[in-house]
């Protein structure tokens, strides 16, 4: 499966910890990420990650384009709900695309853990047939 990892600045440490904790599962899948998030995950875990621009420079839109092309199966986006983001319209557009195309989306660690367990059990294998 193809999984996107995105984290706002104050959530990047959480994403790195999450990726490290679930490294055995992530190793079985293809990972994509916005710039700094992808770099930090790669450096901390050794996982292969295809990196796009940082979110404010268009990375959220690049990942959104993948969703619109049915080229992503899951998005894990650790958002910082307490800090205003300069690219909030891009963030909202990405979340909307996940809804439009029925892409599983987690926006915090608790929901991301649920998705990872579902992924590991094969509960998301239906995505293979939506291509």
From Swiss-Prot:
SUPFAM superfamilies tied to this protein: Methylglyoxal synthase-like
Family: Belongs to the methylglyoxal synthase family.
Binding-site positions, substrate: 8, 12, 34-37, 54-55, 87
Domain MGS-like: start-end pairs: 1-131
Function of the protein: Catalyzes the formation of methylglyoxal from dihydroxyacetone phosphate.
Organism: Bacillus cytotoxicus (strain DSM 22905 / CIP 110041 / 391-98 / NVH 391-98)
Name of this chain's protein: Methylglyoxal synthase
Pfam families hit by this protein: MGS
CDD domains associated with the record: MGS (cd01422)
Top EC category: lyase
Recorded catalytic activity of this chain's protein: dihydroxyacetone phosphate = methylglyoxal + phosphate
Signal peptide residue numbers: none
Gene Ontology terms describing biological process: methylglyoxal biosynthetic process
EC number of this enzyme: 4.2.3.3
Gene coding for it: mgsA
């Amino acid at each position: 499966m193809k999984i996107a990892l995105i984290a706002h600045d104050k959530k990047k440490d959480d994403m790195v910890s999450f990726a490290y904790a679930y490294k055995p599962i992530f190793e079985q899948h293809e990972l994509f990420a916005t710039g700094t998030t992808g770099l930090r995950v790669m450096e901390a875990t050794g996982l292969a990650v295809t990196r796009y621009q940082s979110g404010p420079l268009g990375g959220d839109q690049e990942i959104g384009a993948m969703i619109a092309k049915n080229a992503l199966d899951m998005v894990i986006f650790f958002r910082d709900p307490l800090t205003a983001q300069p690219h909030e319209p891009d963030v909202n557009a990405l979340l909307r695309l996940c809804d439009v195309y029925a892409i599983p989306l987690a926006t915090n660690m608790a929901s991301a853990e649920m998705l990872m367990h579902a992924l590991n059990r094969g509960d998301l294998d239906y995505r293979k047939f939506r291509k």
